[in-house]
Amino acid sequence: MPMLKDPSQKYRPFAPIALRDRTWPDRVIDKAPLWLSTDLRDGNQSLIEPMDAAKKMRFFKTLVQVGLKEIEVGFPSASQTDFDFVRELIEGGHIPDDVTIQVLTQARDDLIERTFESLKGAKKAIVHYYNACAPSFRRIVFDQDKEGVKRIAVAAGRTIKRLAAAAPETRWGFEYSPEVFSSTESDFAVEVCNAVVEVFQPTPANRLILNLPATIECATPNHYADQIEWFCRHVDRRDSVIVSLHTHNDRGTGVAASELGLMAGADRVEGCLFGNGERTGNVDLVTLALNLYTQGVDPGLDFSDIDAVRKVVEECNQLPVHPRHPYVGDLVHTAFSGSHQDAIRKGFAQQDPEGVWEVPYLPIDPADIGRSYEAVIRVNSQSGKGGIAYLLEQEYGISLPRRMQIEFSQVVQKETDRLGLEMSAAQIHALLEAEYLRAETPYALKGHRLQEENGTCALDVEVFDKGESRHWRGIGKGPLEALVACLPVRVEIMDYHEHAIGAGSHARAAAYIELRLDGQRSLHGLGIDENLTTASIRALFSALNRALGQQASIRAA
């Protein structure tokens, strides 16, 4: 069935909230929210193959290592595997003193009782219960009116409160979710939540969590922010309530919705690492946290070795992280475009290690999350001189002069077009060697001897000319002038650069010569040797042979 020409026949737009005095657009997020990971519950239940106990334990320990202080560990009343895992966490002493586990239950007495059985002996625990409140769920799924939905929430709350009072050895926390909050009438969502608040009687010292899920993301992020601000204004005992967000990514804006929800007054965010979860996934806690970090706000979570975290998540979930996933994807710190590479290279050159991060195209320093700079610039047919120069400089210490960068980039471009593939730094270096360092036709340097006296240099060189050994001798003010004087062709040195590669006793010299032969366009040569004079002589021969090769090609054409 094709898409409709008039989708309004089938789909209804969301109804905007009348909130003309909204204040959230003028706010900024200047502190981290409370975080809850639901990887082991919402994330796990969405997997094709849910995690076994060993994977769950590995994931749990990773979450603790990252710094999560509240972790939803399962749905023990719905799964024996989850029940057993909760018991192992408690009985095995795996829960640090500063970490609180959370479990989910439906609003049914038998399931709530089973949930409390799973938590027996826990030092701290949050019991999270829910029931759906949206009109379509009331009508289609549960056949309940508003009063019926509210009665379910209140009755379940009373059961939870009673069972918690019977187990005073545990420090209890409570959370209620009006499921599908984002599609529920705002006044009714507040009405139900206020009835739950009345049951639990929270105080500023012992707050109740009211979690407001965008169970199915159905509107723009600003609409969700309006819902949150309206809720915060109208809920009872606001100072005794933690307003929690639980966004999904059905429209692709879960992160934005959570950020605007925090601006609208929420205190807490539930989500999964790298956005796992039902359908299109829960909000990605990593992206949210690192968005804060790159705004100068400490997120309270540690992703210093983000690839190690990713490895655990991928292996436990059996799902890959997308190469373009923010912050962690294989390609997110990579530039192929020539103009991007040039800007990044210049940014790195000017970046103060102790200063504000200002490298173009990189919103975060890859080193902060355990990434190297090796993959920042990669070369394909779209790349330019900046990226090529950066790779040679970073990997091999070779700093090509600017005009030589332009010249060599054309060589690389031709090769990438031929291959149709990306070129690695090693392949680029091999191409540089073939083009410049092994340019030994028609003249291959065999050896040289230099004598200096009274400011004059006498240079003797031995060369192979088409397989025959020849001796040339030249006089000049320096080695290069002496070499030019003895060449059998007329050349002009247009430019010269040199620098050291490495340091100490193992340092080598790199010399670059731009040379013009008989009025042709100039070409470059490169020489590398432990001795600077030898490197310079090699560079001149490199340029000369390339120029003679070009001349021969022109004549042949």
UniProtKB/Swiss-Prot annotation:
Molecular functions per Gene Ontology: 2-isopropylmalate synthase activity; acetyl-CoA C-acetyltransferase activity; magnesium ion binding
EC number(s) given by UniProt: 2.3.3.13
The protein's required cofactors: Mg(2+)
Location of the protein in the cell: Cytoplasm
Any one of the GO CC terms: cytoplasm
Residues bound to Mg(2+): 42, 246, 248, 282
Pathway(s) where this gene product acts: Amino-acid biosynthesis; L-leucine biosynthesis; L-leucine from 3-methyl-2-oxobutanoate: step 1/4
Chain coiled-coil ranges: none
Catalytic activity: 3-methyl-2-oxobutanoate + acetyl-CoA + H2O = (2S)-2-isopropylmalate + CoA + H(+)
PROSITE patterns recorded: AIPM_HOMOCIT_SYNTH_1 (PS00815), AIPM_HOMOCIT_SYNTH_2 (PS00816), PYR_CT (PS50991)
Keywords tagged on the record: Amino-acid biosynthesis, Branched-chain amino acid biosynthesis, Cytoplasm, Leucine biosynthesis, Magnesium, Metal-binding, Transferase
InterPro entries (alphabetical): 2-isopropylmalate_synth_dimer, AIPM/Hcit_synth_CS, Aldolase_TIM, IPM_Synthase, LeuA-like_post-cat, LeuA_allosteric_dom_sf, LeuA_N_DRE-TIM, PYR_CT
Domain Pyruvate carboxyltransferase: from-to ranges: 33-307
Domain of life assignment: Bacteria
Predominant localisation class: cytoplasm
Region (Regulatory domain): 439-557
A GO biological process held by the record: L-leucine biosynthetic process
Protein family: Belongs to the alpha-IPM synthase/homocitrate synthase family. LeuA type 2 subfamily.
Subunit record text: Homodimer.
Primary role: Catalyzes the condensation of the acetyl group of acetyl-CoA with 3-methyl-2-oxobutanoate (2-ketoisovalerate) to form 3-carboxy-3-hydroxy-4-methylpentanoate (2-isopropylmalate).
Protein name: 2-isopropylmalate synthase
Organism: Azotobacter vinelandii (strain DJ / ATCC BAA-1303)
